[in-house]
Protein backbone atom coordinates (compact mmCIF):
# COMPACT_ATOMS: atom_id res chain seq x y z
CA UNK A 1 0.00 0.00 0.00
CA UNK A 2 2.96 2.33 0.50
CA UNK A 3 4.31 1.78 -3.02
CA UNK A 4 1.33 1.81 -5.46
CA UNK A 5 0.06 4.99 -7.07
CA UNK A 6 -2.06 7.02 -4.61
CA UNK A 7 -5.16 6.82 -6.80
CA UNK A 8 -7.57 5.15 -4.37
CA UNK A 9 -7.34 1.73 -6.02
CA UNK A 10 -5.04 0.18 -3.41
CA UNK A 11 -6.23 0.19 0.20
CA UNK A 12 -5.10 -1.67 3.32
CA UNK A 13 -7.59 -3.03 5.87
CA UNK A 14 -5.75 -3.80 9.10
CA UNK A 15 -5.69 -3.31 12.86
CA UNK A 16 -3.37 -2.11 15.62
CA UNK A 17 -0.82 -4.89 15.08
CA UNK A 18 0.52 -2.40 12.56
CA UNK A 19 1.61 -0.27 15.51
CA UNK A 20 3.08 -3.18 17.47
CA UNK A 21 5.23 -4.21 14.52
CA UNK A 22 6.72 -0.73 14.50
CA UNK A 23 7.20 -0.46 18.27
CA UNK A 24 8.96 -3.84 18.46
CA UNK A 25 11.19 -3.09 15.47
CA UNK A 26 9.64 -5.60 13.08
CA UNK A 27 8.80 -2.80 10.64
CA UNK A 28 10.15 0.70 10.12
CA UNK A 29 6.74 2.29 9.57
CA UNK A 30 3.58 2.86 11.58
CA UNK A 31 0.22 4.50 10.89
CA UNK A 32 2.08 7.71 10.06
CA UNK A 33 3.38 6.05 6.90
CA UNK A 34 -0.14 6.04 5.47
CA UNK A 35 -3.09 8.30 4.89
CA UNK A 36 -5.34 7.03 7.67
CA UNK A 37 -8.86 6.23 6.53
CA UNK A 38 -11.99 5.53 8.58
CA UNK A 39 -12.25 3.02 11.43
CA UNK A 40 -15.08 0.51 11.06
CA UNK A 41 -14.77 -2.47 13.41
CA UNK A 42 -13.82 -3.11 17.04
CA UNK A 43 -13.13 -6.50 18.59
CA UNK A 44 -13.14 -5.83 22.32
CA UNK A 45 -13.99 -9.44 23.12
CA UNK A 46 -10.41 -10.32 23.99
CA UNK A 47 -9.49 -11.36 27.51
CA UNK A 48 -7.92 -14.06 29.67
CA UNK A 49 -9.10 -17.67 29.73
CA UNK A 50 -8.33 -20.46 32.19
CA UNK A 51 -9.15 -24.14 32.53
CA UNK A 52 -12.43 -24.95 34.26
CA UNK A 53 -10.53 -26.54 37.16
CA UNK A 54 -8.23 -23.55 37.75
CA UNK A 55 -8.12 -22.17 41.32
CA UNK A 56 -9.43 -18.81 40.05
CA UNK A 57 -12.39 -17.85 37.87
CA UNK A 58 -12.38 -14.06 38.25
CA UNK A 59 -9.75 -11.37 37.89
CA UNK A 60 -9.64 -10.58 41.64
CA UNK A 61 -9.09 -14.27 42.40
CA UNK A 62 -6.35 -14.44 39.78
CA UNK A 63 -4.59 -11.39 41.19
CA UNK A 64 -4.71 -12.76 44.74
CA UNK A 65 -3.38 -16.12 43.59
CA UNK A 66 -0.54 -14.55 41.59
CA UNK A 67 0.52 -12.43 44.54
CA UNK A 68 0.60 -15.53 46.74
CA UNK A 69 2.51 -17.47 44.05
CA UNK A 70 4.70 -14.84 42.31
CA UNK A 71 6.09 -15.91 38.96
CA UNK A 72 4.51 -19.37 39.14
CA UNK A 73 1.45 -18.88 36.95
CA UNK A 74 2.29 -19.61 33.31
CA UNK A 75 0.78 -17.35 30.67
CA UNK A 76 0.87 -18.36 27.01
CA UNK A 77 1.68 -15.47 24.69
CA UNK A 78 3.11 -14.62 21.32
CA UNK A 79 6.14 -12.56 22.35
CA UNK A 80 6.10 -9.13 20.75
CA UNK A 81 2.50 -9.55 19.58
CA UNK A 82 -0.88 -8.16 20.56
CA UNK A 83 -1.47 -10.61 23.41
CA UNK A 84 2.02 -10.00 24.79
CA UNK A 85 1.27 -6.29 25.09
CA UNK A 86 -2.07 -7.16 26.66
CA UNK A 87 -0.41 -9.25 29.36
CA UNK A 88 2.17 -6.55 30.04
CA UNK A 89 -0.67 -4.07 30.40
CA UNK A 90 -2.35 -6.32 32.98
CA UNK A 91 0.91 -6.75 34.90
CA UNK A 92 1.44 -2.98 34.96
CA UNK A 93 -2.13 -2.33 36.12
CA UNK A 94 -2.21 -4.96 38.86
CA UNK A 95 1.38 -5.46 40.00
CA UNK A 96 1.37 -9.22 39.35
CA UNK A 97 4.01 -11.09 37.40
CA UNK A 98 3.45 -14.11 35.16
CA UNK A 99 5.83 -16.72 33.86
CA UNK A 100 5.48 -15.97 30.15
CA UNK A 101 5.68 -18.84 27.67
CA UNK A 102 5.80 -18.23 23.92
CA UNK A 103 3.29 -20.70 22.50
CA UNK A 104 2.38 -19.03 19.21
CA UNK A 105 -0.91 -18.22 17.53
CA UNK A 106 -4.43 -17.98 18.95
CA UNK A 107 -5.21 -21.60 18.08
CA UNK A 108 -1.86 -22.73 19.51
CA UNK A 109 -2.75 -21.04 22.78
CA UNK A 110 -5.99 -23.02 22.97
CA UNK A 111 -4.10 -26.26 22.40
CA UNK A 112 -1.55 -25.38 25.08
CA UNK A 113 -4.23 -24.49 27.63
CA UNK A 114 -6.30 -27.57 26.85
CA UNK A 115 -3.20 -29.76 27.25
CA UNK A 116 -2.26 -28.21 30.58
CA UNK A 117 0.99 -26.74 29.27
CA UNK A 118 0.02 -23.23 30.41
CA UNK A 119 -2.27 -21.91 33.13
CA UNK A 120 -3.80 -18.93 31.32
CA UNK A 121 -4.09 -17.63 27.81
CA UNK A 122 -5.05 -14.23 26.39
CA UNK A 123 -7.26 -14.72 23.36
CA UNK A 124 -10.26 -13.62 21.35
CA UNK A 125 -13.57 -14.96 22.62
CA UNK A 126 -14.47 -16.16 19.14
CA UNK A 127 -11.41 -18.45 19.20
CA UNK A 128 -12.13 -19.84 22.67
CA UNK A 129 -15.92 -19.99 22.32
CA UNK A 130 -16.14 -23.70 21.52
CA UNK A 131 -14.02 -24.63 24.54
CA UNK A 132 -16.12 -22.40 26.79
CA UNK A 133 -19.34 -23.98 25.55
CA UNK A 134 -17.87 -27.47 26.14
CA UNK A 135 -16.99 -26.53 29.72
CA UNK A 136 -13.22 -26.80 29.24
CA UNK A 137 -12.40 -23.08 29.53
CA UNK A 138 -13.66 -20.18 31.63
CA UNK A 139 -13.55 -16.56 30.44
CA UNK A 140 -12.33 -14.22 33.19
CA UNK A 141 -13.62 -11.11 31.42
CA UNK A 142 -12.73 -8.33 29.00
CA UNK A 143 -10.62 -5.22 29.77
CA UNK A 144 -13.19 -2.85 28.26
CA UNK A 145 -15.28 0.06 29.50
CA UNK A 146 -18.53 -1.77 28.79
CA UNK A 147 -19.64 -5.33 28.16
CA UNK A 148 -19.37 -6.64 24.64
CA UNK A 149 -22.49 -6.17 22.52
CA UNK A 150 -21.75 -9.57 21.01
CA UNK A 151 -21.02 -11.48 24.24
CA UNK A 152 -22.99 -9.57 26.91
CA UNK A 153 -22.77 -12.39 29.47
CA UNK A 154 -19.02 -11.92 29.87
CA UNK A 155 -18.15 -9.33 32.57
CA UNK A 156 -15.55 -6.62 32.26
CA UNK A 157 -12.51 -6.42 34.50
CA UNK A 158 -13.72 -3.00 35.59
CA UNK A 159 -17.01 -4.28 37.02
CA UNK A 160 -15.01 -6.87 38.97
CA UNK A 161 -13.19 -4.02 40.68
CA UNK A 162 -10.00 -4.29 38.63
CA UNK A 163 -8.80 -1.03 37.09
CA UNK A 164 -7.55 -2.45 33.81
CA UNK A 165 -8.45 -1.23 30.34
CA UNK A 166 -6.82 -2.35 27.11
CA UNK A 167 -7.85 -1.56 23.55
CA UNK A 168 -9.04 -4.53 21.55
CA UNK A 169 -8.43 -4.98 17.86
CA UNK A 170 -9.32 -1.71 16.13
CA UNK A 171 -9.86 -2.30 12.41
CA UNK A 172 -9.73 0.42 9.80
CA UNK A 173 -8.51 1.47 6.38
CA UNK A 174 -5.14 2.87 5.31
CA UNK A 175 -4.38 4.48 1.97
CA UNK A 176 -1.06 5.42 0.33
CA UNK A 177 0.45 8.42 2.08
CA UNK A 178 0.11 10.85 -0.84
CA UNK A 179 -3.48 9.99 -1.73
CA UNK A 180 -5.21 13.27 -2.72
CA UNK A 181 -7.61 14.72 -0.17
CA UNK A 182 -10.61 14.50 -2.49
CA UNK A 183 -10.08 10.75 -2.94
CA UNK A 184 -9.71 10.29 0.82
CA UNK A 185 -12.91 12.25 1.44
CA UNK A 186 -14.86 10.34 -1.20
CA UNK A 187 -13.76 7.02 0.29
CA UNK A 188 -14.61 8.12 3.83
CA UNK A 189 -18.07 9.31 2.78
CA UNK A 190 -18.79 6.00 1.07
CA UNK A 191 -17.63 3.99 4.10
CA UNK A 192 -19.61 6.17 6.52
CA UNK A 193 -22.78 5.61 4.50
CA UNK A 194 -22.10 1.88 4.30
CA UNK A 195 -21.68 1.67 8.07
CA UNK A 196 -25.20 3.05 8.53
CA UNK A 197 -26.64 0.05 6.69
CA UNK A 198 -28.30 -2.33 9.16
CA UNK A 199 -27.34 -5.39 7.11
CA UNK A 200 -23.69 -4.37 7.22
CA UNK A 201 -23.88 -3.78 10.96
CA UNK A 202 -25.47 -7.18 11.52
CA UNK A 203 -22.88 -8.91 9.33
CA UNK A 204 -20.12 -7.42 11.50
CA UNK A 205 -21.91 -8.51 14.67
CA UNK A 206 -22.34 -12.01 13.25
CA UNK A 207 -18.55 -12.22 12.94
CA UNK A 208 -18.20 -11.51 16.66
CA UNK A 209 -17.19 -7.88 16.24
CA UNK A 210 -18.81 -4.50 16.83
CA UNK A 211 -19.52 -1.94 14.07
CA UNK A 212 -17.83 1.26 15.25
CA UNK A 213 -17.30 3.98 12.67
CA UNK A 214 -14.70 6.65 13.40
CA UNK A 215 -13.69 9.44 11.05
CA UNK A 216 -10.11 9.35 9.72
CA UNK A 217 -9.14 12.16 12.12
CA UNK A 218 -10.62 10.39 15.13
CA UNK A 219 -9.09 7.07 14.10
CA UNK A 220 -5.67 8.67 13.71
CA UNK A 221 -5.99 10.18 17.19
CA UNK A 222 -6.93 6.77 18.59
CA UNK A 223 -3.95 5.14 16.88
CA UNK A 224 -1.60 7.76 18.33
CA UNK A 225 -2.87 7.02 21.85
CA UNK A 226 -2.57 3.26 21.36
CA UNK A 227 0.94 3.54 19.94
CA UNK A 228 2.03 5.64 22.92
CA UNK A 229 0.73 2.92 25.25
CA UNK A 230 2.57 0.20 23.30
CA UNK A 231 5.81 2.18 23.40
CA UNK A 232 5.53 2.55 27.17
CA UNK A 233 4.75 -1.15 27.69
CA UNK A 234 7.56 -2.29 25.38
CA UNK A 235 10.10 0.01 27.04
CA UNK A 236 9.10 -1.25 30.49
CA UNK A 237 9.33 -4.88 29.35
CA UNK A 238 12.82 -4.36 27.96
CA UNK A 239 13.96 -2.50 31.06
CA UNK A 240 12.84 -5.41 33.23
CA UNK A 241 14.46 -8.05 31.01
Q: Which sequence ranges carry the predicted segments?
A:
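Structural motif detector for alpha-helix initiation sites
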Residues: 58-59, 154, 216
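Conserved functional loop/turn residues at catalytic and ligand-binding sites
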Residues: 5, 58, 116-117, 136, ...
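An extracytoplasmic/periplasmic, membrane-proximal ligand-sensing/linker region
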Residues: 92-94, 181-241
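Hinge/capping helix and adjacent helix->loop/strand transition within the periplasmic-binding protein
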Residues: 3-9, 22-108, 159, 170-203
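C-terminal lobe and pocket-closing loops
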Residues: 127-196, 225-228
Amino acid sequence: VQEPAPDGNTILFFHNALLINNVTGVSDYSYEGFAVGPHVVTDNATGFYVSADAPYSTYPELIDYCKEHPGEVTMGVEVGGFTYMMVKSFEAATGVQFNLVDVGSHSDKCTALLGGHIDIMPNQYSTAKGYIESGDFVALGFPAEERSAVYPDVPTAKEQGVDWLYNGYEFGFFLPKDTPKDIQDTFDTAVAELMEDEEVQQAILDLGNEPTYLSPADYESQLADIQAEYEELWAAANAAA
